[in-house]
Amino acid sequence: MMKHAMILAALAVWPQIATAQEGDYDPAATQSCLAAAKGLDGQRACVGVSAEACADAATGGFSTRSMTGCMASEYGFFDEMLNVEYAKVRELAADLDKQDNGTSFDDVSMGDRLVQMQRAWIVYRDATCAYERRQFDGGTIGELIHVDCLATLTAEQAFRLQNNVLGL
């Protein structure tokens, strides 16, 4: 909800020239939100929390430019989280592959399926966010839309892996 308010605020200042410097991004608010989150909806509500605080504190004030920079940092936070969760699930998949008793519906290992899934997901994320960005060509708001999309979808994938995509 907060990130949508952030995008609407950017639309309100759209005609203004973005002169703000990027704020100092601190992931603490997002980390705290995630620690207190109840379920997937709670986790989703945390996306953009630190980015909004960062943009509010930006030199020159809340602007499209500051929001874009801060959301890019939030994307980096969730990308790192995704990489950590992916490594955990990959390790679990490797362990399960060692225990495979031949009951799989095909001869492809769980680890290989995980890699295939993640590669396909990256293509999906990048295409989806490029499409969303394309709808706003001609202005800086498109950059914010793009990085917000990247952060949101990356966070969703991290949550999916963290909440145990293997169903165990």
Give residue ranges: language-model regions.
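N-terminal signal peptide c-region/cleavage motif recognized by signal peptidases
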Residues: 13-17
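Cleavable N-terminal signal peptides
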Residues: 7-8, 18
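N-terminal alpha-helical modules
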Residues: 20-168
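Positively charged n-region of N-terminal signal peptides that target proteins for export
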Residues: 1-5
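A broad, structure-centric signal for solvent-exposed, well-ordered loop/edge residues
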Residues: 8-9, 168
